Amino acid sequence: MNQTLIQEILEVVEQAAIASAKLTGLGQKDEADAAAVEAMRLRMGKIEMKGKIVIGEGERDEAPMLYIGEEVGSGNGPGVDFAVDPCEGTNLCANNQRGSMAVLAASDTGGLFNAPDFYMNKLAAPPAAKGKVDIRNSATENLKILSDCLGLSIDELTVVVMDRTRHKDLIKEIRGCGAKVQPISDGDVQAAIACGFAGTGTHCLMGIGAAPEGVISAAAMRALGGHFQGQLVYDPAIAQTSEWADYTKEGNIKRLNEMGITDIDKIYEANELASGENVVFAGSGITDGLLFDGVKFERDCVRTSSLVISTLDSTARFTNTVHIKDGAKSISL
């Protein structure tokens, strides 16, 4: 992996964001996702690499493009594994709400955990708390540790939690400690990454979300030096989701075992979910969000705001790109 490849990976998420943003606010979440998928796959196909989707839009029989195991790129060059979410926060995009973005994680072949389409209990925190907070602790314990690490009182801390019924007790505990809760409807990747940057007002992410997005978050947090832990959730009684209405705990355990996951209660650290020597996160805003703006359409150009985090050179680059239209007469600053 090199800087040229990283630049092309940036362009992959930019093109996906632009395609999806054309449908922002139209209430068409499936169409917005499909547009992002097609644009992402098209741009990936132009890269000199032996790419492979390890986390994507589903199994081969469930998704026509960017399915798990699909080969992308020219077929020549370095081997690269991808975990992709072309339109993270499809509902946010469809309703023109904050926080939707096109995201991916990339690493050398074999460098990303092939997360099953399960749920994952997650804990993300700033670099100062790395290895000190622990997902095994109660929220109360972690807030006390986080307070000490950051030099803030607990009532100055903000914790992001997915707004789900399953988090009722977690939210009650956090508020009972005096910390602030910021509920989000979708899109916990951006919230996790925000924990890695001072000044965002986000100090911690707690709770259960999708496992594939957990791998993408872990890649970003590993590159940032932040704290991230994840533990797969296989009990429908804990997940409390209609998607698992016909699933059983025993059936889910069997599914995990069939995937080669025998230590079903393992707690994964960031460097286990994203274990490659070179790890890259790339995200581009579809709608405005905490870390960057969404796509802006102007008469003579389209503007994108993106973030690339890389272990290759230990950088986090915020990039504003002006995509100039044919025949443009005037480009404003």
Swiss-Prot record:
GO terms for cellular component: cytosol. Its cofactor is Mn(2+). It comes from the Bacteria. Mn(2+) 2 binds at residues 85, 88, 213. Substrate binds at residues 88-90, 119, 164-166, 186-188. Mn(2+) 1 binds at residues 33, 57. The keyword Phosphoprotein does not apply. Keywords: Calvin cycle, Carbohydrate metabolism, Hydrolase, Manganese, Metal-binding. Its EC number is 3.1.3.11, 3.1.3.37. GO terms for molecular function: fructose 1,6-bisphosphate 1-phosphatase activity; metal ion binding; sedoheptulose-bisphosphatase activity. It catalyses: beta-D-fructose 1,6-bisphosphate + H2O = beta-D-fructose 6-phosphate + phosphate; D-sedoheptulose 1,7-bisphosphate + H2O = D-sedoheptulose 7-phosphate + phosphate. Pathway: Carbohydrate biosynthesis; Calvin cycle. GO terms for biological process: fructose 1,6-bisphosphate metabolic process; gluconeogenesis; glycerol metabolic process; reductive pentose-phosphate cycle. Belongs to the FBPase class 2 family. Homotetramer. Catalyzes the hydrolysis of fructose 1,6-bisphosphate (Fru 1,6-P2) and sedoheptulose 1,7-bisphosphate (Sed 1,7-P2) to fructose 6-phosphate and sedoheptulose 7-phosphate, respectively. This is D-fructose 1,6-bisphosphatase class 2/sedoheptulose 1,7-bisphosphatase. It comes from Prochlorococcus marinus (strain MIT 9301).
